[in-house]
């Protein structure tokens, strides 16, 4: 959010969380975008498309730094928190799980390491023959996900058969517990059809940002001071909610 302040006084101001600062990010097309002002951080309910809470910070504040403060402001905790890969940090996964919710966040490849033995490069468990195992659903009461033998599930025709790995008629099966790796082990499991379906709902956040910028004067703000900017953005959010009620 750009605010019209004398930026030549920037060197005289402290980065204390209240003064305007330069912000930088890449847009949806990968182009660099800079602005001088503040940044609005929102939590949006994907069903209504309306905000549940927000914070305002100087523009140089990283988005991920406001994830936990926003969660703490929530009156009711949702089932899922959907965030983009900029929020891919272990402290955020842990905070979400402590609140009894699930984090649906794409992996930031810069944070990745070589997968442990028994996992492919997508962090998907493989059997002793190297075949990806079949996802068999989440077990919420155990905070775990279950995988089964791809041969007995009819996904692969393993020439060794299922007895190679297990004496069970169902073949080899395994559980992964979220507490062991909350970043990679999600309920539902990362990159399954259900996981992708849930993540797609995150578009509600971008739509709301676009709406208040284009229609409610949230983009260029002609006032100074964090408290005034916060009040202005609160009015933008409130106006959007009133319009939503009227248009029902």
Residue ranges: model-predicted function:
Residues 50, 97-99, 113, 143, ...:
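Alpha-helix termini
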Residues 75-76, 116-117, 122, 126-128, ...:
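Short, intrinsically disordered/low-complexity patches at protein termini
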Residues 79, 133-135, 221:
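Short secondary-structure junctions
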Residues 86-89, 130-131, 244-247:
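A general structural signal for short secondary-structure boundary/capping elements
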Residues 93-210:
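Helix-centered, glycine/charged polyanion-binding patches within enzymatic domains
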Residues 195-248:
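Basic, amphipathic alpha-helical segments enriched in Lys/Arg and hydrophobic/aromatic residues
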